[in-house]
């Protein structure tokens, strides 16, 4: 069973955004659609993240999982599209990515999975991290014994066994994670993976990047870079990477009403982080939320949520989702380029309790002319919500993406 493009257009007629009157730029338009109607069915597909598998007819592969409460995630599934995200197949479970009992009476699962295609081995590497639940189904051990886990889908479409990414750094004795994070694959097949980590006895986490080898079966850390810290609450979280031109960029979630950005020439050794600001120097006000890169060969963009007059009472200001172009030299956002990817629905000031909020999203370049942003609504009373997709139309082709 698939979700048809006809139903997309019928359910969201009039949501194409031509951006008339906006300054000439790379983003020509944004077209929004519903992938799965979780508000109606009660089955909410969360953490939708896709990657592109090249070929004569490229395939898109998405990982996603159901959510039934705050951080209460279930079996990780996969879906695919063979028509550039016009339709998606019914989600199917990935073997081994459900819950499993632990010796101390908990259940261990997997969440926050990000799939990415690895050209050298023609595999999809799907990486998330482990998560624990007690007998009542509530989140347990949120800050200890957490680590990255991954599965590999080979070129024949078969999923391998769940594996742990091992790291013997004593500064990561409590936990180390690469959850929801964008990675960068190098020309030689090595992979740059961003990590957030901390030792036992210390609450705030640091971030760094590691270089991994990958042979299509095993992922191994062989080198790590310098560490950034921010000793406020849980510190620095959920770093994501992008490469633009000859430089690497990392965006970082934080818990001091800021997000941070830094740049590197090799993807391992990073300049001092700085808060995300507008090009006039005013810092963005964020609330421990993710940011995601939206790369294009002619410009680097960031997708994010932030404080806005329309969302003052929405938890963590998690909607709207915005996009802006980055000034890669100054490491700031160009205010005049900001656009709304997913708008706020309802009244975020006087009736915020009824506003579906977002905040867990991902970007995927699907063709030279298009990228997509995928996310899922959360409605607090029911944890129901629709799974959403925004199609970004580029005014110029993205030369980093080949048709086949």
Enumerate the language-model features and the residues they cover:
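N-terminal secretory signal peptides and thylakoid transit peptides that target proteins
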Residues: 1-15
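Generic low-polarity alpha-helical segments
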Residues: 5-9, 115, 148-150, 293
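Beta-rich carbohydrate-recognition and catalytic domains
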Residues: 23-44, 52-108, 117-176, 184-238, ...
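Conserved beta-strand position repeated once per blade in WD40 beta-propeller domains
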Residues: 47-49, 112-114, 180-182, 238-240, ...
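Short amphipathic alpha-helical surface patches that serve as generic macromolecular interface elements
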Residues: 320, 357-360
């Amino acid at each position: 069973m698939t979700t048809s493009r006809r139903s997309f257009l019928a359910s969201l007629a009039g949501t194409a955004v031509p951006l008339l009157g906006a300054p000439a730029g790379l983003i020509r338009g944004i077209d929004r659609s519903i992938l799965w109607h979780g508000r109606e069915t009660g089955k909410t597909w969360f953490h939708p993240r896709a990657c592109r598998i090249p070929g004569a007819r490229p395939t898109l592969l998405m990982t996603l999982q159901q959510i039934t409460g705050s951080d209460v995630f279930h079996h990780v599934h996969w879906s695919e599209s063979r028509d550039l995200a016009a339709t998606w197949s019914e989600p199917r479970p990935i073997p081994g990515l459900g819950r499993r009992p632990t010796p101390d009476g908990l259940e261990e699962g997997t969440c926050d999975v990000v799939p990415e295609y690895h050209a050298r081995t023609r595999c999809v590497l799907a990486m998330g991290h482990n998560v624990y639940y007690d007998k009542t189904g509530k989140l347990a051990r949120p800050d200890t014994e957490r680590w990255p886990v991954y599965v590999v889908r080979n070129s024949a479409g078969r999923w391998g066994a769940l594996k742990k990414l091992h790291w013997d750094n004593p500064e990561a004795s409590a936990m180390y994670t690469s959850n929801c994070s964008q990675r960068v694959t190098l020309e030689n097949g090595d992979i740059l993976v961003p990590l957030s980590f901390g030792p036992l006895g210390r609450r705030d986490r640091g971030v760094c990047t590691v270089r991994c080898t990958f042979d299509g079966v095993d992922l191994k850390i062989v080198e790590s870079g310098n560490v950034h810290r921010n000793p406020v609450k849980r510190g620095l979280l959920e770093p994501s990477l992008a490469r633009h031109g000859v430089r690497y960029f990392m965006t970082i979630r934080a818990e001091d009403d800021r997000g941070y950005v830094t740049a590197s020439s090799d993807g391992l050794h990073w300049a001092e982080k700085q808060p995300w600001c507008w090009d006039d120097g005013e810092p963005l006000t964020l609330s421990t939320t993710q940011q995601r890169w939206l790369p294009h060969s002619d410009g680097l963009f960031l997708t994010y949520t932030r404080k806005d007059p329309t969302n003052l009472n929405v938890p963590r200001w998690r909607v709207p989702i915005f996009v802006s172009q980055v000034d890669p030299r100054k490491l700031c956002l160009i205010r005049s380029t900001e656009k709304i990817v997913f708008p706020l629905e309802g009244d975020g000031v006087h009736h915020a309790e009824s506003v579906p909020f977002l905040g867990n999203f991902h970007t995927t370049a699907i063709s030279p002319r298009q990228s997509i942003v995928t996310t899922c609504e959360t409605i607090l009373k029911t944890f129901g919500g629709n799974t959403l997709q925004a199609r970004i139309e580029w005014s110029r082709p993205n030369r980093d993406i080949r048709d086949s």
